């Protein structure tokens, strides 16, 4: 095991690395939060800073450590502290959830400072119960460091619906308050996260969600070009007048993930039954406009594996497609 003195040296050196890179005008810095790594007699701080995620793929982390750490400062070979940095991020992101109060909403935040991607998802209490699992799944396949914000909504049907509509399931109608929700995101959530987590001004923002939150993400991207991408898993594209609205005011982002369960359109609800035809049409229209868009069919109905389906949506939206 590394002596306490050596652990302190490592922490100081990693802090020095972060400081140096924050003054690098050409590359953004990101850092994995502190976490003690136990295993194989090794105990070091996993506070490793380096340049953008691409650096993790070409060995920059190893190069940085080799320049800053000296064998005399360690009681074990230097190779033992050259860790798989992408794995570090995957492990750390799932255990670093924190609550940040933004306005009147307690937002749950995961991920890294100075991240290249900011992922936003409107959630209800039920989804929050599986959020750790969803974010861990995103991190497992992510090629880029990201900051993830789960933003709670109290009235799902009201806060995420773009306009008023009668109830289609049960007795709860739709209040049409999506404009207020979008204003809260753009004027409070995003600025707060950028400042608090040192996100670059040009951070790529992906708005995503499941069901009505997926529709909200699609609708929001008709109102602003702020979003780099949309991750819409099983979106409620059956919503009355949505397809006509999108034709008149098209989605502005160029990166759109769409998915649907292969049993979702097999419903006796005549309003919701159009979801399959609508999502096929929307996908075709977006492709015809030249958008980077995919439509994935998942096995099962609407309530199967919502967390994993949404994770796949965010993963795709962060990938580079040619």
Q: Which residues does each PLM region occupy?
A:
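A conserved short beta-strand
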Residues: 226-237
